[in-house]
Amino acid sequence: MATIKDVAKMAGVSTTTVSHVINKTRHVADETKQTVLDAIKALNYSPSAVARSLKVNTTKSIGMVVTTSETPYFAEIIHAVEEQCYRQGYSLFLCNTQNDPDKLKNHLEMLAKKRVDGVLVMCSEYKDDSRDLLKSFSYLPIVIMDWGPVNPDTDLILDNSFEGGYLAGKHLVDNGHKKIGYLSAELTKVTAKQRYQGFIKALSEANVEMKSEWLFEGSFEPEDGYECMNRLLALEDRPTAVFCCNDIMALGAISAITEKGYRVPDDFSVIGYDNVHSSRFFAPPLTTIHQSKARLGERALRLLFERIAHKDAKRETIEIHPELVIRKSVKKIA
């Protein structure tokens, strides 16, 4: 593998001149510059990214730590972030934690050793030790992309799950539903709890009370939506509509409904959350709460770049508001 010394020898210049040509740190005569570039091409020389980063104090790389890259919601956000990084000339290191604090610690240590310019963190739940861990990496520019720990050492993007839950509940009561169930992820998770609280507020404003037996907890997976809906269908007194904590749970719920010979929305109305790309192709197309994954990725990355440029500036919290997307899975009743 060619070195900078090999390039300098072939071009008949010093290694310092080669460095200036590569890093554009000083004017070099056009003829000399072309000679160096020709030597680089002939030798197939690739500058050391680490060595270059030490000179210019940037690696043009970003770390992203997520719970998982497999679920549609996370996958779409990761795609949006990667697209924004590419346009800005940055590389993206993706790390999955599965909500394991040890993995979070190891990933952050690895990213710090790779001298990434900053880190985006998006995990579905933050335990106390995770909060303390993030504080110990306060020397890294970090942006939290969801309902994470609010502390003075990190910037934060909030998706306002409370407002989204409220929009879902209000849409159902506005369509005449008074018997409404909720298929939730574990209510110990902040996002699920916030969506539930917003949902209950909308029902309360309309003087609609949700029976406790119509609340089922699972996880953010289709299997849990399917299982919870089957338990709901087994009840004698059943709701006319259900709010699912995310679109993937709604997919499982719709599958359970159709397997029992019922139809959506004729027999049961279903509303989801997230507006993942595939939700428009559900049968029927899913009414859901939209969170712009592209906007979330863009805002988070922009905030991170601002933090990288101004490390001592006051930490910011930016709120992104969800929107209702009406399709064909909710029926208006008298």
Curated annotation (Swiss-Prot):
Give the source species. Answer: Mannheimia succiniciproducens (strain KCTC 0769BP / MBEL55E)
Ranges where the HTH lacI-type domain occurs: 2-56
Which GO molecular function terms does the record list? DNA-binding transcription factor activity; transcription cis-regulatory region binding
Q: Which processes are annotated in GO (biological process)?
A: negative regulation of DNA-templated transcription; purine nucleotide biosynthetic process
Relate the protein's function as given in its record. Is the main repressor of the genes involved in the de novo synthesis of purine nucleotides, regulating purB, purC, purEK, purF, purHD, purL, purMN and guaBA expression. PurR is allosterically activated to bind its cognate DNA by binding the purine corepressors, hypoxanthine or guanine, thereby effecting transcription repression.
Query: Is Transcription regulation there in the keyword field?
Result: yes
Q: Quote the PROSITE patterns the UniProt record gives.
A: HTH_LACI_1, HTH_LACI_2
Binding positions for hypoxanthine? Answer: 73, 189, 191, 220, 274
Q: What is known of its domains?
A: Consists of two structural and functional domains: an N-terminal DNA-binding domain, approximately the first 60 residues, and a larger C-terminal domain, approximately 280 residues, which imparts the function of corepressor binding and oligomerization.
Q: What is this protein called?
A: HTH-type transcriptional repressor PurR
Q: Which CDD domains match?
A: HTH_LacI, PBP1_PurR
